[in-house]
């Protein structure tokens, strides 16, 4: 009996330490497991941070130019017919960050936009357009003369309103500058947009408002149609990358009457416009056109009707980093209608015909750094018709350098401009200009 007690005592003495060892081992296993899980979590966090950094770098490389919400200084128009103009600071379907010029009322967002721009211009040769560089106004009679001009007429003020109507974005946009007579406020844009319908005044459907060269000069090159007018536009997207738009727009052709004949120009039908655009991640290609009809009614005799029209091929491609190459080609009888020129003129027999015009624009925009950029563009145009229009050829060349500051809300720039005008009797006029500008965008 005593021996059994001794055996039991020995067993108990052995089991107690073994139990403690087992418990200690289990605790050690739990600690090791926790350490393994923590290490795995650290690895996941590291991988997630790497992904976030990579996304930030990608976004920075793919970003637009500084101040992109206020586009290339002299343009604005509905992006692809579905969004607000690039340079108008109009609210988009997603609410922009709050700023002193952005406020809301319920579900409606209001954005006051625009900028102040000072232009300092020096002409080394005579030219009729002192505020813009228009080769059509270059004299060919050998006139000499210099001119210095400082103005702020391009300064803009806009109001964009966005809100939901039946769970769809409804947009209103108003914009003006001071290019009216005697620096008066001038309406540029005033339109409403809901789903596929846009009504009001804005850039014509015929033009490519997303491919207007980024010149400091307000005029822009010759192949880019540049018209804002009253219109009704329908837009649809057949696929994710394609867009179709059709417009009925104000017609405003300029007609040169036959020699010695007095009368008036009648706008018998509107301009019918259309565009097709294909877009991918690096740029877009657009084909657009317009057709219309105008009439000259002499004070005595029968009226003459003339059909006018034109086509535009436009392309823009992001080449390296933020650099962009772009080109436009336009052609048509009566194309001058969209560049402030003559649409119809009489031939040698006095019969009224459309003036046939073709133009080309090619340019490259380069970013030297996040704050420094340059743009160079060349644009010739030819008047093909042998009509009463005395002009035969125009050239427009521009090269500039910009520096962005104030957190990309302002820039200073310097631009050189060269222009040529040549007439059918082989007379020529040349113009050289230096233009400096300072622009401050609204917050």
Where is each model-derived feature located?
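Bacterial N-terminal signal peptides that target proteins for export
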Residues: 1-8
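Bacterial N-terminal signal peptides
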Residues: 9-18
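N-terminal periplasmic/intermembrane-space "pro-region" immediately following the signal or transit peptide
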Residues: 22-126
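Outer membrane beta-barrel
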Residues: 97-254, 266-269, 273-284, 316-317, ...
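Sequence/structural signature of outer-membrane beta-barrel proteins
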Residues: 121-123, 164, 177-181, 206-208, ...
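Detector for outer-membrane/organellar transmembrane beta-barrel domains
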Residues: 278-391, 395-396
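Outer-membrane beta-barrel "beta-signal"
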Residues: 405, 430-443
